[in-house]
Amino acid sequence: QDLPPNLSLALGTANLTPMEIATGWSTFANGGYKISPYIIDKIESRNGDTLFVANPPSVPKGDTATSGIAAPTDEAFTINPTPGEAPATTAATEQAPAVAERIVDARTTYILNSMLQDVIKLGTGRRALALGRTDLAGKTGTTNESKDAWFSGYNGDYVTTVWTGFDQPESLGRREFGGTVALPIWMSYMGAALKDKPPHTQPEPEGILSLRVDPISG
């Protein structure tokens, strides 16, 4: 209900947060499933009792992505206990795994991925070729008067969105665009996140037909 009902919606007139953008783009990366980002994986009491275990919707096994925008790590954060002991519960560990809902056909996301990969191979995201990877897809974004500059991109494992701008919208300056301001930040992070990781792209689903077209005769 927050999307403006006007013809320029396709050009980006809606206001979205980086988290909302990254959540939406995860559907492209995982082959068409709706996931829910989360931060806390598990909560334990000071006695080691499990009080909470996250159960985000997960992409079915055999499909491209994992649950959430980024998989939880093994690193644990300890919070100093407060007076009073919360009752231990085992219900949190007995949840049935939630299955993510498919919201886009796999053939549609495959074609879209191919188009977004061309942004990096041939378009405004060409700087990302410096990462030396063949599995990256993304898109630059720049609002009127360069008040916002974006770059969103992914491979089959990670989705990252970078926004640059001011709290009170004003121009970032002349010739400041998504490809010149946001993309270098995205490259710095993704270069580290994907270091030594093998390429991971969405497999071609059934029902896709690829043909070569003669550029002269069509």
Where are the language model's segments positioned?
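A penicillin-recognizing enzyme superfamily signal
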Residues: N15-G218
